[in-house]
Amino acid sequence: MAKILLFSDIHVHPHKRKHERLLDCLKALRWVFDQAVEKQVDAVLFGGDLLHERQKIDSFTYTEVFKILENYKNCNFRTYLLLGNHDMWFSNSWSVNSIYPFGSLNNFTTVIEPKEISISGSTWHFLPYTHNPFEDLQKLPMEDRSSKYLLGHLSIDGAKLNSAGSVADVSVEHDGDMVKVDRSIFKEYKHAYFGHYHGAQKLAKNVEYIGSPLQLSFGEAGEDKHIIILDTNKNTQEYIKNDFSPKHYYIDEENLDSYSREELEKSFVCIVTKGDLSTENKKNLEDKISNLGIDSVKLKTKSKEVSDHVINDAKLVLADENKIIEKYVEQVQVDHLEKDILIGLGKRIAEYESAE
């Protein structure tokens, strides 16, 4: 049996068009592998989306990632890189992808199709990004899954999409019906780990999203980030927190004074104001921002008079693009088409676009 490090969805890229954000990603990537060395793990498993850009990858970004991985090619552990949707050129084919060259490194394996692999005494099923896990799980051995682990990159119904609380609504066409892709599909496994959604979360005792190792956007504001060390002998997990990468904050204007410079320095902050600021108030706010050393800031204005029922209606519809799709199909004339299938296709398109 073995000690295995799991991480996912690092999306290396100069996010926000800032070189510093690229450096944040590279620093987090080094930290992951340094932890693997320090913890003396037997393997590193990555759950997909190593790079952010799908089709036009910056040469500097790609080279720096390659250099970091190359530094760990002679360590006493093997690294397995699973294919995520951001690693794929085509949305529905694994054939062309950006992680393939990393498989040329010693002790690195890229997994670009469903595969069963024995890793230091434990058996793992790998499931690259898929729109239809029902179909692709059938490509893996069915027997004795209760003793095996799964690492996949996909959408699961009911999972949290972001820190605002939006929830995934995921269905696919299977055997002529629209079927929910829910956590029960993976209940047979000893433990199932997933990449794709960036918020670490447990959907069941044995089903969880690993989450990204650093905050990449305001959609991850307030989320703690970690990597996982799995002891397959004891089937126990240690969560190692990333306490160094910049964070994202939503802060009400009147609460800004309650934060320290240490908390906000080099962070990304969205200050929520109650209305348009006077010249004097704007100057006071700018002084506070400067004194706190905030690296990046944007302002967001609250509506002054919005009734509760309007807010609730907006949350029900606008916060979830799936609701918009369902509403649209209800209102247009599509009697000659299967509405459930049409809605399912729309949701898949929306999910793919939102992942971009």
Stretches with model-predicted labels:
Residues 65, 87-178, 213:
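Conserved catalytic scaffold of divalent metal-dependent phosphoesterases
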Residues 38, 43, 231-356:
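Accessory, non-catalytic peripheral segments of nucleic-acid enzymes
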Residues 156, 162-234:
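Conserved beta-sheet core of the metallophosphoesterase superfamily
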Residues 2-4, 43, 122-123, 147-149, ...:
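Structural motif
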Residues 11-15, 52-55, 81-93, 117-118, ...:
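Active-site environment of divalent metal-dependent phosphoester hydrolases
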Residues 2, 14-116, 185-189:
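Core catalytic region of metal-dependent phosphoesterases/phosphodiesterases
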Residues 9, 29, 44, 49, ...:
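Divalent metal-coordination and catalytic microenvironments
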Residues 1-25, 143-144, 149-151, 155, ...:
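Mobile, glycine- and charge-enriched loop segments
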